[in-house]
Amino acid sequence: MKSPAVPALDLPAEGETGVVDIGPLTLESGAVIDDVSIAVQRWGELSPNRDNVVMVLHALTGDSHVTGPAGPDHPTPGWWDGVAGPGAPIDTDRWCAVSTNVLGGCRGSTGPSSIAPDGRPYGSRFPAVTIRDQVTADLAALEALGITEVAAVVGGSMGGARALEWIVGHPATVRSALILAVGARATADQIGTQSTQVAAIKADPDWCGGDYHDTGRVPSTGLAIARRFAHLTYRGEVELDDRFGNHAQGDESPTDGGRYAVQSYLEYQGAKLVERFDAGTYVTLTDALSSHDVGRGRGGVRAALQGCRVPTIVGGVTSDRLYPLRLQQELAELLPGCTGLDVVDSVYGHDGFLVETEAVGKLIRRTLELAER
């Protein structure tokens, strides 16, 4: 069931999903998407001046459902449960936490699985979007809600890339930022692993050139393989070896056609994603991450970052092998509004920014203190 459209200057009820219609959107490439909708959720009350909004920006396979139980509009519990609420790091007695499903997504916002104006799914006709385009769409949704400035933008991974683009491209609209587990641009390693995941999906015969949505076919095998590969980059090497080692799965014999325990684990992760996520969205957002470069059109990374004065906290995870600490160190050194890199000690790899809620919660609280100054 499609979530109800949110009238201008109105937010959905707390924890519920609404949709903001922002009209046509011109992308960085010059392409135009007609009739764009952005799904939105919020926790906490908007202040009379509409100046207490904390934007919480999700990663690749996330959505607007930051916290709370599963429900009709969100098949899984909140992806950052406990981060927002009364007394939480984003204390909803003071702040209004707002989250959108990103442009190109599949959980209420316009994306490849959405119905185009001609009545058919966009599929392969959905244009390439960039991180910059995603921020443009978020800002348009906020403007439709009568919100012209936010207290903070908070995000990790793709959410961190969005937060970075936000403060560099639109500094007058934000008072502080928390950028976690991301870099200033995509690296060769990231582009390599991400493009390989996309290739796995496109090699699935059920991909149908991206136009599978109204055929009854779904590229489940390709998406599951992509997720298995991605999940390896999300977790820490030591953590995985401690959990699984080279052990067999149950009574299976890997030397006789059986599986290793880690294989079973990755298969499970792939199957879980297939149940809730669209392959076209996975390709669209993965390609957006590969194109991430905050310095594009701004004189390069150094010039772009050094020109940003927004008070910012940058955090990285010790065992992150997808976005290693050197990338956050570069951000911390070049952003004038950052006083140094904050390191989260964790064995959980890239996912540490999601798992280590106590340590990350402290960074969120500090970020919101910056917004109060």
From Swiss-Prot:
Its EC number is 2.3.1.31. The active site is at 157 (nucleophile), 320, 350. Coiled coil: none annotated. Pathway: Amino-acid biosynthesis; L-methionine biosynthesis via de novo pathway; O-acetyl-L-homoserine from L-homoserine: step 1/1. One of its GO terms (cellular component) is cytoplasm. One of its GO terms (molecular function) is homoserine O-acetyltransferase activity. Residues 52-356 form the AB hydrolase-1 domain. It is found in: Cytoplasm. It catalyses: L-homoserine + acetyl-CoA = O-acetyl-L-homoserine + CoA. Its main location: cytoplasm. Gene3D superfamilies: alpha/beta hydrolase (3.40.50.1820). GO terms for biological process: homoserine metabolic process; methionine biosynthetic process. Substrate binds at residues 227, 351. Keywords: Acyltransferase, Amino-acid biosynthesis, Cytoplasm, Methionine biosynthesis, Transferase. Transfers an acetyl group from acetyl-CoA to L-homoserine, forming acetyl-L-homoserine. Belongs to the AB hydrolase superfamily. MetX family. Homodimer. This is Homoserine O-acetyltransferase. It comes from Mycobacterium sp. (strain KMS). The lineage of its organism: Bacteria, Bacillati, Actinomycetota, Actinomycetes, Mycobacteriales.
